[in-house]
Amino acid sequence: MAVFLWIYGFMSPIAGMIADRVNRKWLVVGSLFVWSGVTYLMGYADNFHELYWLRAVMGVSEALYIPSALSLIADWHQGKSRSLAIGVHMTGLYVGQAIGGFGATVAAIFSWHTTFHWFGIVGMIYSVVLIFLLRENPDRMIAEQPSSAAGKEKRPSLFGGLSMLFSTWAFWIILFYFAAPSLPGWATKNWLPTLFSESLDIPMAEAGPISTITIAFSSFVGVILGGI
């Protein structure tokens, strides 16, 4: 899990720069397809090293999603509906975590290979569906076309943009706000099923759903209320 988080964190700002320059619809679709494909391939892994490198690839592909998806939402929603739309979108993260806990149940009934295969196939199918349902906001595309030449001249350099970002206090406050709960949050989500199983003698098939549902439910409520 650590290699995924390190690469995800390193790639996130790079993914943001990519999302500013290419079609975000295809970044979302491609990101979902690749990380679902990687999930599927994990079912064929024979050793730790194969799982390790597949998780590393997943970190790259997942990092491309959030900047593209959130900026698309911002283009389609203005005013009060924007916060709610982002909140509703983020509920998917926690619903997915809750459902993901049942992966332990599926693994107990069938095998962990089957679990990776099923979740991967569902994700790849959904990415194909998004090809037909997801699109860029045409108003933004039209607004950018006439001033494309001027926009290239006015666009700040990479170092200029980073300098402007790092000199903004709001950026550091938000960064700390996300970092502080993430430190215990990721540790809890990763190890709580194992803790329940080994310390409380709860079968992993039950420990998985119990640990993910409890955290995901409160997070689900929080992002909805925050969006409102």
What are these regions (language model features)?
Residues 16-17, 21, 105, 227-228:
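Membrane-interface helix termini in secondary transporters
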Residues 47-55, 173-174:
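Short hydrophobic/alpha-helical segments at membrane-entry points of transmembrane helices
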Residues 89, 93-138:
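Helix-loop-helix hairpin linking two adjacent transmembrane segments in secondary transporters
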Residues 166-223:
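Extracytoplasmic gate region of multi-pass secondary transporters
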